[in-house]
Structure formats: structure tokens, C-alpha cells
């Protein structure tokens, strides 16, 4: 199967806000980072408004909605408060993620299969408001099928475990995880879902994931913000964009 089209890059700017909040200052500004990302080739900006506001804050979402030219993808937990915020702002996309206060980052996918009734009701008003709803899930068949059942338009496959295995040099396990992700992407596409992928992606892991023909968007943040310390945000994003495009071209 040939790639379905140009692979989009969503840049997550959460950790610009992490640096800002570490000192309680007004800088660095997440919106400024978003605008730099736009100029460097990002197709969209992702921001996770966590319940504890540990990085992105409510006022950041307002500023991003007003200042960005590319679409905003709002990551959030499935709580009434977050639903109300999304319905007020009506971002282009809403990605629903699991959330625990004690975690350092999103550790796994959302359990759609175990909460179909509630999530179907949660998703419906977001869809009615014009938001493209995405479920951040693992490659488990049940979760993919349940995401289609509740009316999500998109699934974002959690690539964190694969990226960790690559970083740890566990080659055989990484190959098995990559194949499971590939099969998950194919299943999701066959069910009419648009397929995205994200979490933990770096220069070392992007090519294999970008080569999945069904994947239409990668969301990448922490690595790019870290790389920006050494080479600048624009250069870091351009480097990722080049690797994505090369992998896509090779898969065509």
C-alpha cells in the first residue's frame, strides 16, 4: 500500500510552558514557540491542558486560539471541566488522553473499550461543535474498534513503548512492537478512522513510523523542545520535517 498522502507534523509545545513555569515567569511564551513552529513547517500545534495545569494554562489556550494560523490540537482528559473548555474554544481538534496526577507524562492509552457508553456521550457534543475528536490509544484491537464505535474521527497510536525499546537497544522487542503498531494502523484505517501517531518520537525513530502508509499525522514535542536547546527550535523542526518527508518518499 502506498502512503495515503502528505504526512503532517504537529508540534507539541507543552514543555516550553514547563520551562516558563519552573521560574514563574512570563517567558518563554508558548504562543511564540507555536509561531516559530509554523514558520519552520509545522502543520499544526498541540497543547495538553492538564487538570493540574503543570505546563499549559487556560490563558495559553486562549492565546493560541487567537494567535495561531495553523490548527490547534487540544489534548485533554475526559472530564466535564475539560469538555466545557473545549466547547468554549472549539479548537480544530481535541485529543482525549488518560491522565493521572502522579505521572510525569502520559503513560498509556485511554481505555475506550472499558468506557464506551460514557465516552460516546462525551464525544457527541464535541463533534457537534465541529471538533475532530481523536482517541490516544495503544494498538490493541479492542481499543481501535471501540474508538470507531464511539464516533471518534481519529485515533492517535501511542508510540512511546516502541521508542523506549529502540533507545534501550532492545532490537527484537522493538521490531515486534513496530509490527503491532503497523497492524493497528491498518486496522484503524480499515474501520474508517484517520490514523495519527505520537509520543517519544525522535530523529532515531521517526522514519519507521512515518513509513506507515495509513498514518497521516505525527505529533512530536518533548524531543523537539530538547533538541531546540542545542540547535534552535526552527532548525530542530526542519530536521524532523526532512526525516519525515524522506521516509514517506521512500515508502511511496
UniProtKB/Swiss-Prot annotation:
UniProt subcellular location: Cytoplasm
InterPro entries, per the entry: Aldolase_TIM (IPR013785), PyrdxlP_synth_PdxJ (IPR004569), Pyridoxine-5'_phos_synth (IPR036130)
Gene Ontology cellular component list: cytosol
Chain positions recorded as 1-deoxy-D-xylulose 5-phosphate binding sites: 14-15, 50, 55, 105
Pathway where it operates: Cofactor biosynthesis; pyridoxine 5'-phosphate biosynthesis; pyridoxine 5'-phosphate from D-erythrose 4-phosphate: step 5/5
Keyword presence, Phosphoprotein: no
GO biological process: pyridoxine biosynthetic process
Reactions that this protein is recorded to catalyse: 3-amino-2-oxopropyl phosphate + 1-deoxy-D-xylulose 5-phosphate = pyridoxine 5'-phosphate + phosphate + 2 H2O + H(+)
Family of the protein in this entry: Belongs to the PNP synthase family.
Lineage, highest ranks first: Bacteria, Pseudomonadati, Pseudomonadota, Alphaproteobacteria, Rhodobacterales
Protein known as: Pyridoxine 5'-phosphate synthase
Name of the gene: pdxJ
Broadest EC class assigned to this enzyme: transferase
Subunit structure: Homooctamer; tetramer of dimers.
UniProt-listed NCBIfam families: pdxJ, PRK05265.1-2, PRK05265.1-3, PRK05265.1-5
Molecular function in Gene Ontology: pyridoxine 5'-phosphate synthase activity
SUPFAM superfamilies: Pyridoxine 5'-phosphate synthase
EC number(s) given by UniProt: 2.6.99.2
Coiled coil: none
Alphabetical list of Pfam families matching this protein: PdxJ
Amino acid at each position: 500500500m502506498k502512503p495515503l498522502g502528505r504526512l503532517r507534523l504537529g508540534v507539541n509545545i507543552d514543555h516550553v510552558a514547563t520551562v516558563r513555569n519552573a521560574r514563574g515567569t512570563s517567558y518563554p511564551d508558548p504562543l511564540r514557540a507555536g509561531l516559530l513552529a509554523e514558520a519552520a513547517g509545522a502543520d499544526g500545534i498541540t497543547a495538553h491542558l492538564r487538570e493540574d495545569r503543570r505546563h499549559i494554562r487556560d490563558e495559553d489556550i486562549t492565546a493560541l486560539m487567537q494567535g495561531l494560523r495553523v490548527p490547534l490540537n487540544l489534548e485533554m482528559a475526559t472530564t466535564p471541566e475539560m469538555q466545557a473548555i473545549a466547547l468554549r474554544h472549539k479548537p480544530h481538534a481535541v485529543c482525549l488522553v488518560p491522565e493521572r496526577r502522579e505521572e510525569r507524562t502520559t503513560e498509556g492509552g485511554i481505555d475506550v473499550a472499558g468506557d464506551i457508553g460514557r465516552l460516546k456521550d462525551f464525544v457527541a457534543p464535541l463533534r457537534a461543535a465541529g471538533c475532530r475528536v481523536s482517541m490516544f490509544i495503544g494498538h490493541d484491537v479492542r481499543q481501535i474498534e471501540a474508538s470507531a464505535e464511539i464516533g471518534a474521527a481519529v485515533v492517535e497510536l501511542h508510540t512511546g513503548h516502541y521508542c523506549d525499546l529502540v533507545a534501550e537497544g532492545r532490537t527484537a522487542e522493538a521490531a515486534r512492537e513496530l509490527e503491532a503498531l503497523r497492524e493497528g494502523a491498518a486496522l484503524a484505517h480499515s474501520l474508517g478512522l484517520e490514523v495519527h501517531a505520537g509520543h517519544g518520537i525522535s530523529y532515531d525513530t521517526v522514519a519507521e513510523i512515518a513509513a506507515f502508509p495509513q498514518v497521516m499525522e505525527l505529533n512530536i514535542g518533548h524531543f523537539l523542545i530538547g533538541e531546540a536547546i542545542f540547535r534552535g527550535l526552527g532548525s530542530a523542526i526542519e530536521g524532523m520535517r526532512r526525516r519525515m518527508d524522506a521516509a514517506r518518499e521512500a515508502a511511496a
